[in-house]
Amino acid sequence: MKYEIYFDESNKLDQKTDNYSYYGALGASIQIIDKLNDNVSQINGSLNSKSELHFVNYTNDDKFIKYFEVISYVLNQDIKINIMIVDNNDAKEIAEKMNISIVELRELFYVKIPERLFYGLARNLNSNESIDIIIDENSEYEKINLMTKLEEQMNAHSVYRNKGYKVSSVKQKSSENEIPLQIIDTIMGIIVFLVERNFEEQSSKAKIIKSDLIYRLLIHNNNLEKLHNLVNLYKWNNKSEDITLLDLSKYTGSFIIMKAEYDIKEITRLSKIMAKYPNKVTKFYREKMKYSNRQLRQLKGYISELEDKGRNNF
């Protein structure tokens, strides 16, 4: 049987504005990947959507149904995701001790961190399993010959630990043609959003829109539990030789509490407006709430809740 691993990164070590860098890997059997591709293609077809899934681009909730349906589907599949957080300040301290540049350190991380993430996905595979690794296109990977290094490292791991799996290929591909790369990008984007508490910035329309999507995903059926089971979140720092497994529920819990408090205030405000001006069109209430036209799904969710139909009745 063939197994596939998809790798992506967010916030680079040498980007001075970011405190943390993130590396993510998604792993699943080829059968699950094929089902995932088919399902997402069907969702795109039903919605007449040709856009890629990228969390950074989710700034208008006219794509709400697409993101909601795709991510809800993914959370219920036999997929595993490993994400590692790197403290950039700790990394810079290491670079100074080694007397190397942060760019050189990043090249070293490119080999070690993906290897750790991939091994975590591969270690329980059956003997004779064949693995293909797909990396989001990046010209920097070619410069450091990352594909060859990863293949050698992973196969060395398999031999040393007597696992029996074999990495057959490591290739760069464009996310435009690889739905799993879009999935790891989106889920990692959600995790970064929660870890960095971007939901606290309530003056940003884009972050309010992102928060609404995440909240409605997490309260739907058992998606919260599914996310906790799907994602392993690790952190690297220079204080220990071992990486630390973080409790994802700490981040989702803080988010849900704050978002619920925010929603209560907004729904109460909307309820008063609707009582004062009954039977008006949605645009009227949107303007009274001072929402942009990018927040239509958010408003409809609130109206649905006031009508006792549930937040996700669409």
Residue ranges and their predicted role:
Residues 2-14:
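Two-metal-ion RNase H-like nuclease active-site motif
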Residues 9-11, 27-29, 137-139:
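Short, flexible loop/turn elements at secondary-structure junctions
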Residues 13-17, 71-74:
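Short secondary-structure boundary/capping segments within folded domains
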Residues 14-16, 36, 143-144:
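Short helix/loop capping segments that flank catalytic or ligand/cofactor-binding pockets
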Residues 16-33, 187:
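Acidic, metal-ligating active-site segments
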Residues 32, 36-58:
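Compact, glycine/acidic-enriched structural inserts
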Residues 48-78, 85-88, 102, 133:
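Structured, acidic catalytic/metal-binding patches in enzyme active sites
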Residues 79-314:
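Charge-dense, low-complexity intrinsically disordered regions
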